[in-house]
Amino acid sequence: MFENALAVLRAYDRIVIHRHKNPDGDALGSQIGLAALLRSNFPEKDVRIVGDAAGRYAFMEGAIMDEVPDDFYAGALAVILDTSATHLISDDRWRTAAHTLRFDHHIFCEKIADDEFTDTSYESCCGLIAAFAKETALKMSPLAAKSLYTGMVTDSGRFRYDATTSQTFALASYLLQTPFSISEIYAGLYADALESVQLRARFVLKIQKASASVAYIYTTKEEAASTGTDTFTISRGMVGTMADIKGIDIWVNFTESDGGVLCELRSSRYNINPIAVKYGGGGHAKASGATLPDKSAAGAMLRDLCEMAGETCTL
């Protein structure tokens, strides 16, 4: 499988690497990591990365995006990483490339690229890229190894989630054969400003229960604006405040935005992906997302989740 992907990459002198909007550690790690791999193994190629700002993961080396003029795409290859749907891809210019290639580990939603390499057995897209590098015997650079390891760590929940397998640790071990500082990665992931800690405390106090084992947070546009932070930080960043609560098997973070109600679903027990798909979203079995039209849709989703848990919704 990976030899075919390598053949596609070899065929183009100009390559632009895309990933999903509002990047997490896996999106950035796979993007930076693949770019570093290609640059070190094929120095004659012009490889660039594009997308919106790194946000919370700006500490990652190589996280500043490249300037790419529109005409660069003529005759170029666009690589799409860690993305299951076209509307999630950051920078729509991938459509103008001569050829497209996708690597992804999400549950399949739609065909996006001319050539696709997707495999849900990987805990992260970074794990998939690491396997690609290993099986095709590409030279691993310190930046590539560090970036890919970072994405594996973040998408596996520091190797805690069910998607973590022996394959995960084997690939992590493979990456660690190339010298880089693990302490720098964890310092970036765990170090928080006082304001961030206070923000989390504020959201802990907002946690409510829809049933015995289903928890949620709902944040209005006015409440979000009062925090002084962006909606993505609230939506993706605060869903974790409900994790590891005894007796809570499903938790959802709803955040009103200009584009609708952002929804982050998580579970320690159930496959909540079908619920996300029902509401136009997607993702993984136990970590998915969607954008809802309004608060009433959020209530409907909560009722569906309570039914999944076999409980009566108290809304």
Tell me what each language-model feature is.
Residues H106-L171:
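Short alpha-helices
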Residues K21-P23, T83-T86, H106-F108, K221-E223, ...:
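Short glycine-rich anion-binding loops that position phosphate/pyrophosphate groups of nucleotides
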Residues H18, N22, I80, R102-F103, ...:
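Generic enzyme active-site microenvironment
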Residues E61-D115:
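Active-site cofactor/cluster-binding pocket
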Residues G33-A35, R95-A98, T118-D119, A170:
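Glycine-rich, phosphate-binding/catalytic loops in enzymes
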Residues F2-R19, G29-A58, D70-G75, T154-L315:
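Hydrophobic helix-and-loop "lid/oligomerization" segment in the mid-to-C-terminal part
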Residues G25-Q31, H87-I89:
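Short glycine/serine/threonine-rich phosphate/pyrophosphate-binding segments
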